[in-house]
Amino acid sequence: MARPRPREYKAGDLVFAKMKGYPHWPARIDELPEGAVKPPANKYPIFFFGTHETAFLGPKDLFPYKEYKDKFGKSNKRKGFNEGLWEIENNPGVKFTGYQTIQQQSSSETEGEGGNTADASSEEEGDRVEDGKGKRKNEKGGSKRKKSYTSKKSSKQSRKSPGDEDDKDCKEEENKSSSEGGDAGNDTRNTTSDLQKAGEGT
Protein backbone atom coordinates (compact mmCIF):
# COMPACT_ATOMS: atom_id res chain seq x y z
CA MET A 1 0.00 0.00 0.00
CA ALA A 2 1.41 3.38 -0.97
CA ARG A 3 2.10 5.93 1.72
CA PRO A 4 -0.15 8.97 1.76
CA ARG A 5 1.38 12.28 0.83
CA PRO A 6 2.60 14.12 3.91
CA ARG A 7 -0.02 16.57 5.09
CA GLU A 8 -0.33 19.48 7.46
CA TYR A 9 -1.27 18.79 11.07
CA LYS A 10 -2.40 21.13 13.80
CA ALA A 11 -2.19 20.95 17.59
CA GLY A 12 -4.68 18.44 18.96
CA ASP A 13 -4.78 16.14 15.91
CA LEU A 14 -4.77 12.44 16.82
CA VAL A 15 -2.28 10.35 14.86
CA PHE A 16 -0.21 7.19 14.81
CA ALA A 17 3.43 8.21 15.03
CA LYS A 18 6.25 5.99 13.76
CA MET A 19 9.67 6.02 15.38
CA LYS A 20 12.49 3.67 14.46
CA GLY A 21 12.36 0.51 16.54
CA TYR A 22 8.77 1.05 17.70
CA PRO A 23 5.35 0.17 16.32
CA HIS A 24 3.08 2.91 14.97
CA TRP A 25 2.20 4.49 18.31
CA PRO A 26 -1.03 6.31 19.26
CA ALA A 27 -0.12 9.97 19.64
CA ARG A 28 -1.32 13.55 19.51
CA ILE A 29 0.13 16.63 17.86
CA ASP A 30 0.95 18.85 20.83
CA GLU A 31 1.22 22.60 21.16
CA LEU A 32 4.58 23.95 22.23
CA PRO A 33 4.65 25.07 25.87
CA GLU A 34 6.09 28.50 26.54
CA GLY A 35 9.86 28.49 26.86
CA ALA A 36 10.21 25.08 25.20
CA VAL A 37 12.81 24.35 22.57
CA LYS A 38 11.51 25.12 19.09
CA PRO A 39 11.25 22.07 16.84
CA PRO A 40 13.37 21.73 13.70
CA ALA A 41 11.77 23.00 10.50
CA ASN A 42 8.78 20.98 9.29
CA LYS A 43 8.59 18.82 12.46
CA TYR A 44 5.73 18.58 14.90
CA PRO A 45 5.83 18.18 18.69
CA ILE A 46 4.31 14.77 19.42
CA PHE A 47 2.80 13.49 22.67
CA PHE A 48 2.71 9.69 22.93
CA PHE A 49 -0.26 8.14 24.70
CA GLY A 50 0.48 5.43 27.25
CA THR A 51 4.06 6.51 27.96
CA HIS A 52 3.35 10.28 28.09
CA GLU A 53 6.67 10.95 26.39
CA THR A 54 7.33 13.49 23.68
CA ALA A 55 9.34 13.81 20.47
CA PHE A 56 9.56 15.86 17.28
CA LEU A 57 8.56 14.04 14.09
CA GLY A 58 8.12 15.02 10.47
CA PRO A 59 4.85 14.55 8.60
CA LYS A 60 6.15 11.46 6.76
CA ASP A 61 6.17 9.58 10.10
CA LEU A 62 2.63 10.62 11.07
CA PHE A 63 -0.57 8.85 10.04
CA PRO A 64 -4.09 10.15 10.76
CA TYR A 65 -5.63 8.15 13.61
CA LYS A 66 -9.12 7.65 12.17
CA GLU A 67 -7.88 6.42 8.77
CA TYR A 68 -5.27 4.01 10.18
CA LYS A 69 -7.05 2.81 13.32
CA ASP A 70 -7.88 -0.58 11.78
CA LYS A 71 -4.34 -1.11 10.51
CA PHE A 72 -2.24 0.08 13.48
CA GLY A 73 -4.77 -0.03 16.34
CA LYS A 74 -4.27 -3.68 17.27
CA SER A 75 -3.08 -4.54 20.78
CA ASN A 76 0.64 -5.04 21.25
CA LYS A 77 2.73 -6.40 24.13
CA ARG A 78 5.07 -3.39 24.05
CA LYS A 79 4.99 -1.61 27.42
CA GLY A 80 2.58 1.31 27.37
CA PHE A 81 1.10 0.56 23.95
CA ASN A 82 -2.23 -0.92 25.08
CA GLU A 83 -2.57 1.89 27.64
CA GLY A 84 -1.98 4.31 24.78
CA LEU A 85 -4.76 2.77 22.70
CA TRP A 86 -7.12 3.08 25.66
CA GLU A 87 -6.07 6.70 26.33
CA ILE A 88 -6.45 7.90 22.74
CA GLU A 89 -10.04 6.59 22.76
CA ASN A 90 -11.12 7.47 26.31
CA ASN A 91 -8.90 10.37 27.39
CA PRO A 92 -7.43 12.09 24.32
CA GLY A 93 -7.00 15.36 26.21
CA VAL A 94 -4.56 13.93 28.78
CA LYS A 95 -1.83 16.45 29.55
CA PHE A 96 1.92 16.04 29.53
CA THR A 97 2.89 16.31 33.21
CA GLY A 98 6.62 15.66 32.89
CA TYR A 99 7.50 19.25 31.94
CA GLN A 100 6.05 20.60 35.19
CA THR A 101 7.78 17.84 37.16
CA ILE A 102 11.13 18.67 35.55
CA GLN A 103 10.64 22.35 36.41
CA GLN A 104 9.92 21.47 40.05
CA GLN A 105 12.95 19.18 40.15
CA SER A 106 15.31 21.86 38.83
CA SER A 107 13.97 24.46 41.27
CA SER A 108 14.40 22.05 44.21
CA GLU A 109 17.99 21.34 43.12
CA THR A 110 18.84 25.04 43.20
CA GLU A 111 17.35 25.42 46.67
CA GLY A 112 19.45 22.54 47.99
CA GLU A 113 18.90 18.89 48.65
CA GLY A 114 16.26 18.29 51.25
CA GLY A 115 16.22 14.48 51.18
CA ASN A 116 12.45 14.52 50.86
CA THR A 117 10.93 11.29 49.56
CA ALA A 118 8.42 13.24 47.48
CA ASP A 119 11.30 14.87 45.63
CA ALA A 120 12.77 11.46 44.82
CA SER A 121 9.55 10.23 43.26
CA SER A 122 9.16 13.35 41.16
CA GLU A 123 12.77 12.95 40.01
CA GLU A 124 12.03 9.48 38.71
CA GLU A 125 8.93 10.68 36.90
CA GLY A 126 10.86 13.53 35.31
CA ASP A 127 13.64 11.25 34.15
CA ARG A 128 11.19 8.85 32.56
CA VAL A 129 9.70 11.45 30.31
CA GLU A 130 12.80 12.82 28.66
CA ASP A 131 13.79 10.77 25.65
CA GLY A 132 10.71 9.89 23.63
CA LYS A 133 8.61 6.76 23.66
CA GLY A 134 10.05 3.85 25.59
CA LYS A 135 13.65 5.07 25.57
CA ARG A 136 13.82 5.96 29.20
CA LYS A 137 16.89 7.66 30.53
CA ASN A 138 18.04 7.02 34.08
CA GLU A 139 14.84 5.36 35.12
CA LYS A 140 16.43 4.55 38.42
CA GLY A 141 18.87 7.44 38.33
CA GLY A 142 18.56 8.51 41.96
CA SER A 143 18.45 5.05 43.54
CA LYS A 144 22.20 4.37 43.78
CA ARG A 145 23.64 5.18 47.17
CA LYS A 146 27.08 6.39 48.00
CA LYS A 147 29.04 4.30 50.46
CA SER A 148 28.79 5.58 53.98
CA TYR A 149 31.94 5.44 56.07
CA THR A 150 30.42 6.99 59.20
CA SER A 151 29.14 3.63 60.45
CA LYS A 152 32.67 2.17 60.64
CA LYS A 153 33.98 5.21 62.46
CA SER A 154 31.17 5.14 64.97
CA SER A 155 31.70 1.44 65.69
CA LYS A 156 35.40 2.04 66.38
CA GLN A 157 34.57 4.99 68.59
CA SER A 158 32.13 2.91 70.57
CA ARG A 159 34.88 0.33 71.28
CA LYS A 160 37.15 2.95 72.84
CA SER A 161 36.68 3.50 76.51
CA PRO A 162 36.53 7.16 77.58
CA GLY A 163 39.90 6.94 79.38
CA ASP A 164 41.80 5.44 76.39
CA GLU A 165 43.57 7.99 74.27
CA ASP A 166 46.36 5.84 72.88
CA ASP A 167 45.43 4.31 69.49
CA LYS A 168 47.89 1.41 69.93
CA ASP A 169 46.05 0.15 72.98
CA CYS A 170 42.76 0.39 71.11
CA LYS A 171 44.10 -1.54 68.11
CA GLU A 172 45.60 -4.23 70.34
CA GLU A 173 42.26 -4.67 72.09
CA GLU A 174 40.53 -5.03 68.72
CA ASN A 175 43.05 -7.63 67.56
CA LYS A 176 42.66 -9.61 70.80
CA SER A 177 38.88 -9.57 70.56
CA SER A 178 38.91 -10.79 66.96
CA SER A 179 41.40 -13.59 67.60
CA GLU A 180 39.70 -14.65 70.84
CA GLY A 181 36.39 -15.18 69.08
CA GLY A 182 34.97 -11.68 69.42
CA ASP A 183 32.09 -10.52 67.30
CA ALA A 184 33.32 -11.52 63.85
CA GLY A 185 30.35 -9.84 62.18
CA ASN A 186 31.57 -6.40 63.22
CA ASP A 187 35.31 -6.98 62.73
CA THR A 188 36.16 -7.56 59.06
CA ARG A 189 39.93 -7.64 59.52
CA ASN A 190 40.31 -11.43 59.66
CA THR A 191 43.55 -12.08 57.83
CA THR A 192 44.57 -15.15 55.90
CA SER A 193 46.86 -16.15 58.77
CA ASP A 194 43.83 -16.18 61.11
CA LEU A 195 41.99 -18.37 58.61
CA GLN A 196 45.00 -20.70 58.27
CA LYS A 197 45.23 -21.06 62.06
CA ALA A 198 41.56 -21.96 62.19
CA GLY A 199 42.03 -24.49 59.38
CA GLU A 200 45.05 -26.14 61.09
CA GLY A 201 43.11 -26.59 64.31
CA THR A 202 40.57 -28.89 62.66
UniProtKB/Swiss-Prot annotation:
Region (Disordered): 90-202
Record field: compositional bias (Basic residues): 134-159
GO biological process: microtubule polymerization; negative regulation of microtubule depolymerization; neuron projection development
Pfam families noted in UniProt: PWWP
Protein's name in the database: Hepatoma-derived growth factor-related protein 3
Organism: Rattus norvegicus (Rat)
Assigned keywords, A-Z: Growth factor, Nucleus, Phosphoprotein
Tagged with keyword Phosphoprotein: yes
Modified residues (Phosphothreonine): T110
Sequence ranges assigned to domain PWWP in this UniProt record: 11-68
Disulphide linkage map: none
GO MF assignments: growth factor activity; microtubule binding; tubulin binding
UniProt biased composition (Basic and acidic residues): 168-177
Compartment(s): Nucleus
UniProt entry tagged with the keyword Transport: no
Role noted for this protein: Enhances DNA synthesis and may play a role in cell proliferation.
Name of encoding gene: Hdgfl3
A GO term from the CC aspect: cytoplasm
Lineage: superkingdom: Eukaryota
InterPro entries linked: PWWP_dom
Span of the annotated motif Nuclear localization signal: 135-147
Chief location of this protein within or outside the cell: nucleus
Chain positions found as Phosphoserine: S121, S122, S161
